[in-house]
């Protein structure tokens, strides 16, 4: 993990004084670090860029690894930004995509994926970027606004994704 953290810091340009968010995760024998750049006007938040560093052992197919990291980031962002199921009178209110708003490709920020070169046994890349993405963005929002997101999706805390 230490190597992933060092590379993540260098690749993202993170240094003292930057207002960014960070989170790291380990699963399926894979290390992932996410650095998030956001901008905000009040509680209107824009995700400018995600920097993802992954160490999954020998990178057998780098294009697939990048795609999995990007897709996992999208899934994690969806949970943070807008995935919400509500109920009324014991029934789910979201019955189709006109009432349930998943993250769309047009909502995705720029994503930079750095794959760590390694001689270790190849490991899983299907899900490890999901868990740290939301927390990295939430930490970036805190760094920029001084307010913590305490409920998901972030609209529950009064924030809006723009």
Question: Which sequence ranges carry the predicted segments?
Answer:
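Cofactor-binding beta-sheet edge motifs in enzyme active sites
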Residues: 1-162
């Amino acid at each position: 993990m230490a190597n992933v953290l060092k590379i993540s810091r260098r690749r993202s340009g993170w240094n003292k004084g930057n207002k960014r968010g960070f989170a790291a995760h380990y699963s399926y024998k894979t290390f992932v670090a996410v650095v998030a750049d956001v901008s905000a006007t009040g509680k209107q938040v824009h995700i400018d860029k995600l920097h993802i560093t992954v160490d999954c052992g020998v990178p057998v197919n780098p294009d697939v690894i990048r795609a999995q990291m990007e897709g996992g980031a999208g899934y994690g962002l969806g949970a943070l930004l807008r995935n919400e199921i509500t109920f009324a009178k014991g029934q789910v209110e979201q019955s189709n995509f006109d009432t349930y708003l998943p993250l769309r490709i047009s909502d995705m920020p720029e994503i930079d994926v750095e794959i760590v070169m390694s001689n270790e046994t190849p490991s899983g890349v299907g899900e490890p970027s999901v868990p740290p993405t939301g927390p990295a963005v939430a930490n970036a929002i805190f760094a920029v606004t001084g307010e913590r997101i305490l409920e998901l999706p972030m609209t529950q805390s009064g924030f809006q994704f723009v």
